[in-house]
Amino acid sequence: MSKSFTFKQFHIDIGSCGMPVSTDGVLLGAWTNISECSQILDIGAGTGLLSLMSAQRNSNAHIDAIELMPIAAEVARLNFSQSPWKERLVLIHQDFLSYQTAYEYDAIICNPPYFNNGEQSLKGERSTARHTDSLPFDKLLQHCKTLISSTGRASFILPVFEGEIFIKIAKGCDFHLTKITKVKTTEKKSPTRLLIELSLFPHIYQESTLTIHDGNGYSDDFIKLTRMFYLNMG
C-alpha cells in the first residue's frame, strides 16, 4: 500500500493509519454540493481527504473534521498543517455521537462504515473505519439531524445495497432524498455505489448515473468531475 498520494493542490500522507485514498472518497469529495456553504462538517475524517477537497473547492468555508481513531486523527492533523488551507481546517479528535456545537452546518459529508460485525475481516483502524458497529446508520443520521441547518445538505457514499437501507433509515429520521447518483464502473455493469444527498428541506429531487470507465479509459463525466484534483487528468 502506498504511504502517500499527491493531488494537484494538496498531498495526503497515509502513515500507519491503514486508510488508503479511495475512489469512493474522491467521488464524494468532488460530487458534494458545497458551493455556497460557510460551515462544513466532515464525519470520520480519516486522513482528511474530504476536508481537503472541500477546502480546495470552497475558498470561504470553515471545515470541522471529526475523527475518533487516534492514529488517523494525527495523520489528518498533519495533512491539514501541510495544506494551503490550514487556517480553515480544524481536526476534532472525538466520538461523533457525543459531538456538540453552538452553530449549525450548511453541509455534512461522510463516507460511512458499511460492514456489519463479522462480514469483513480487516485489521486495526481500517477495520473500525468500515464496520457499522462503530457508527450505526440510525445513530449517525439522528445526530446529523441535530447538527445540520434547516436547508443544509448531507452527502454520503455507500454500496448500493447498504445505500438503499441507509435511505430508508434517513426518511424515518425526517430527511428528504434530494439527489442521488448511481455509480457504475463501466456502462454494461450494474451500479456499485450510490452518492446520496439528504436534506431536512425538500429540495428539487435529482437523479443521475455516473460511469467511471469507457472504452478509452476514464469516461468524460468522471474526468469532468475529478479533473481539478487528480494529476494527469487534464
UniProtKB/Swiss-Prot annotation:
Reactions mediated catalytically: adenosine(37) in tRNA1(Val) + S-adenosyl-L-methionine = N(6)-methyladenosine(37) in tRNA1(Val) + S-adenosyl-L-homocysteine + H(+)
EC number: 2.1.1.223
GO MF entries: nucleic acid binding; tRNA (adenine-N6)-methyltransferase activity
Subcellular location(s) per record: Cytoplasm
Signal peptide: none
Keyword S-adenosyl-L-methionine: yes
Keywords of this entry: Cytoplasm, Methyltransferase, S-adenosyl-L-methionine, Transferase, tRNA processing
Domain of life: Bacteria
Alphabetized InterPro entries for the sequence: DNA_methylase_N6_adenine_CS, SAM-dependent_MTases_sf, Small_mtfrase_dom, tRNA_Adenine-N(6)_MTase, tRNA_adenine-N6_MeTrfase
Protein's GO biological process: methylation; tRNA processing
Known role: Specifically methylates the adenine in position 37 of tRNA(1)(Val) (anticodon cmo5UAC).
Family: Belongs to the methyltransferase superfamily. tRNA (adenine-N(6)-)-methyltransferase family.
Record's protein name: tRNA1(Val) (adenine(37)-N6)-methyltransferase
Source organism per UniProt: Aliivibrio fischeri (strain MJ11)
Phylogenetic lineage: Bacteria, Pseudomonadati, Pseudomonadota, Gammaproteobacteria, Vibrionales
